[in-house]
Amino acid sequence: MARRIRVPLGFLFAVAYIWLAQPTKTSLIAGTLVLVPGLVLRGLASGHVQKDEQLTTSGPYAYTRNPLYLGSLMLAAGFAIAARSWWIVAVMLLMFAAIYIPVIAGEERSLGQKFPGYDDYARHVPRILPRLTPYGNQDGAYSSALYWQHREYQAGIGCVAMLAVLLIKLVAKLVW
């Protein structure tokens, strides 16, 4: 259920976000400094993961079992900072807890059933916060073809668009 409502809730949240956001020059810069590494992390992760084909333990997956979700959390934190609204922070935390935590748990159950080495991997690699040293061997290489196949570029386009909206809102506030 959480997986199905994720996208529609995201659109509703985007409208509320734009309405409630009160960006400043400082909040936009600080938020961007948090969200850009999240975008990079998502890009690196999507260039390593071979969904449903093999257990991915290379690249960012050697540090955290869920680099895509960690990247998404960093994006959310960056946008919360950029918006300068405690309501947005609270809603983002609630959405993550209500939607992403159950989705992650379900995906991990599925991976445990599908891939024999998953349980050992899960014992050594944290769910979200990364470990300091890589797990296992680093045989898997980054693939730009996977990045494009997974359409991860859409996250970058969305981030640029939302930052542009926040910038327009800031400039409009200064001009009026």
For each predicted feature, which ranges?
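Short, conserved phosphate/pyrophosphate- and ester-handling motifs at nucleotide-, phospho-/glycolipid
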Residues: N66
